[in-house]
Curated annotation (Swiss-Prot):
Superkingdom of origin: Eukaryota
Residues recorded as bearing Phosphotyrosine in the entry: Y135, Y512
Role: Mitochondrial glutamate dehydrogenase that converts L-glutamate into alpha-ketoglutarate. Plays a key role in glutamine anaplerosis by producing alpha-ketoglutarate, an important intermediate in the tricarboxylic acid cycle. Plays a role in insulin homeostasis. May be involved in learning and memory reactions by increasing the turnover of the excitatory neurotransmitter glutamate.
Regulation: Subject to allosteric regulation. Activated by ADP. Inhibited by GTP and ATP. ADP can occupy the NADH binding site and activate the enzyme. Inhibited by SIRT4. Inhibited by HADH.
Name recorded for this polypeptide: Glutamate dehydrogenase 1, mitochondrial
Principal EC category: oxidoreductase
Signal peptide: none
Single GO biological process annotation from the record: long-term memory
Organism per entry: Rattus norvegicus (Rat)
Residues holding substrate: K147, K171, S438
Expression (tissue specificity): Widely expressed throughout the hippocampus. After induction by training, highly expressed in the dentate gyrus, pyrimidal layer and lacunosum moleculare.
Length: 558
């Protein structure tokens, strides 16, 4: 059974009655039993959640195995949705056969299908030779191509790429992007290499992936991740298109996150951070959730802290700042800064570009202690995995944790946040903006035309004809004795009169995707009485969608 594979431990079988009246009321909010009606939350009550956790994932509570951690979260979702999957099966099997089918497919979904481990030599600029290690994990091919970033870090490991690949599968499913999950890592510190050496490493890694069948527009499509960006993606695209893909007209679709000149798309660089903003916006504007947290809806009076001032942290900060929230703290690996009056993201970005660090920023002071425990409304961990653990979770002061990074919260910390009535907007939803816009870029590369190019002039002419038609109708009705009756477009309409640009289409598509997925998560949380356990609701949605693909496609050669 799939739950035994994850060694699920039911942490508590105690009912609400054993916990006292306050806990009983709050337990009703989170739904102790499937099918139990949830009570209206009473002010001041702290919900207490008890869910299925993976024993394997929590055996090292402050530093759990990352892949087992993801498997544990999967098990929680699977345990809740199993009965519905059995009920929805439209086959002529009996109840036991249907349940066996469901459990069998869930066992298929859970493991990582392929892991490629590579070692290859490069010659450094000083003439010395070095062997570089790299990995590419493909979690699922239920949809192809597989999709996932490439990171450069000395912390890269098989466990990490497997965990991140599995998260990508569920992330794509949550936001309805038709990809399987994958992830790659090269075990280097890019700061220790020249640009020429990094190009050698990137191009050689691309060739090794190509030789093993781990890259291609319809096979496996990498993207930027930690310490990689447009430059590295351009090298990958050029290497693939110049070698194994030289006969493939779609060769540049082998990777996303490219520069515009290489087939990239407007809005990709900021996509993950913009997705974080939209995700927070969708939940913070939902009055029912804010009433549980004791907060007012909207961003206007909210403060936030960002851990990690890279691509995700910077753009999350920019958009939240633009829409009225105040950034009071920013943390990086070399230290943190604090200003209760607010930190301007553009000024901080310029300072870091000039000095290489946020420390010393003149409009903020150094923050002593962990920035994760700073006083704020919204905490955005946008650095690396396993930052919020059993040790520091009790001291977190934020009421909303928005997971900009992948896997920043351990299972034990997640349990503590539920018990403390803290909302966690989960990673597999919140940071899906990057893969969503990567999907748009991939489609652009396959179509060989930018969004909006075919309709710009037609839409502009149509809009002017519409305005002229209105003007002529008014003049026929009221006459011209007082002069013409000009119909002047508003400033907002004037901006859109030529139709949507590529950036407009990308931003609109991303906003719609994040809003629709948020509504799906909210409905699932309500349906299963999950309360603030949005992570489990997101996993339930992902599991249902992936299960449907496997079930309807059939399992070959069984």
């Amino acid at each position: 059974m799939y739950r035994r594979l994850g060694e699920v431990l039911l942490l508590s079988r105690a009912g609400p009655a054993a916990l006292g009246s306050a806990a009983a009321d709050s337990a009703a909010l989170l739904g102790w039993a499937r099918g139990q009606p949830s009570a209206v939350p009473q002010p001041g009550l702290t919900p207490v959640a008890r869910r299925h956790y993976s024993e394997a994932a929590t055996d090292r509570e402050d530093d759990p195995n990352f892949f087992k951690m993801v498997e544990g979260f999967f098990d929680r979702g699977a345990s809740i949705v199993e009965d519905k999957l059995v009920e929805d099966l439209k086959t002529r099997e009996n109840e036991e056969q249907k349940r066996n089918r469901v459990r069998g497919i869930l066992r298929i979904i859970k493991p990582c299908n392929h892991v490629l481990s590579l070692s290859f030599p490069i010659r450094r600029d000083d003439g010395s030779w070095e062997v570089i290690e790299g990995y590419r994990a493909q979690h699922s091919q239920h949809r192809t191509p597989c999709k996932g970033g490439i990171r450069y870090s000395t912390d890269v490991s098989v466990d990490e790429v497997k965990a991140l690949a599995s998260l990508m599968t569920y992330k794509c499913a949550v936001v309805d992007v038709p990809f399987g999950g994958a992830k790659a890592g090269v075990k280097i510190n890019p700061k220790n290499y020249t640009d020429n050496e990094l190009e050698k490493i990137t191009r050689r890694f691309t060739m090794e992936l190509a030789k093993k069948g781990f890259i291609g527009p319809g096979i496996d499509v990498p993207a930027p991740d930690m310490s990689t960006g447009e430059r590295e993606m351009s090298w990958i695209a050029d290497t693939y298109a110049s070698t194994i893909g030289h006969y493939d007209i779609n060769a540049h679709a082998c990777v996303t996150g490219k520069p515009i000149s290489q087939g990239g798309i407007h809005g990709r660089i900021s996509a993950t951070g913009r997705g974080v903003f939209h995700g927070i916006e969708n939940f913070i504007n939902e009055a029912s959730y804010m009433s549980i947290l004791g907060m007012t809806p909207g961003l206007g009076d909210k403060t936030f802290v960002v851990q990690g001032f890279g691509n995700v942290g910077l753009h999350s900060m920019r958009y939240l700042h633009r829409f009225g929230a105040k950034c009071v703290g920013v943390g990086e690996s070399d230290g943190s800064i604090w200003n209760p009056d607010g930190i301007d993201p553009k000024e901080l970005e310029d300072f870091k570009l000039q000095h290489g660090s946020i420390l010393g920023f003149p409009k903020a002071k150094v923050y002593e202690g962990s920035i994760l425990e700073a006083d704020c409304d919204i905490l955005i961990p946008a650095a690396s995995e396993k930052q919020l653990t059993k040790s520091n979770a009790p001291r977190v002061k934020a009421k909303i944790i928005a997971e900009g990074a992948n896997g920043p919260t351990t299972p034990e910390a997640d349990k503590i946040f539920l018990e403390r009535n803290i909302m966690v907007i989960p990673d597999l939803y919140l940071n899906a903006g990057g893969v969503t816009v990567s999907y748009f870029e991939w489609l652009k590369n396959l179509n060989h035309v930018s969004y909006g190019r075919l309709t710009f002039k037609y839409e502009r002419d149509s809009n002017y004809h519409l305005l002229m038609s209105v003007q002529e109708s008014l003049e026929r009705k009221f006459g011209k004795h007082g002069g013409t009756i000009p119909v002047v477009p508003t400033a907002e309409f004037q901006d859109r009169i030529s139709g949507a640009s590529e950036k407009d289409i990308v931003h609109s598509g991303l906003a719609y995707t994040m809003e629709r997925s948020a509504r799906q998560i909210m409905r699932t949380a309500m349906k299963y009485n999950l309360g603030l356990d949005l992570r489990t609701a997101a996993y339930v949605n992902a599991i249902e969608k992936v299960f449907k693909v496997y079930n309807e496609a059939g399992v070959t050669f069984t």
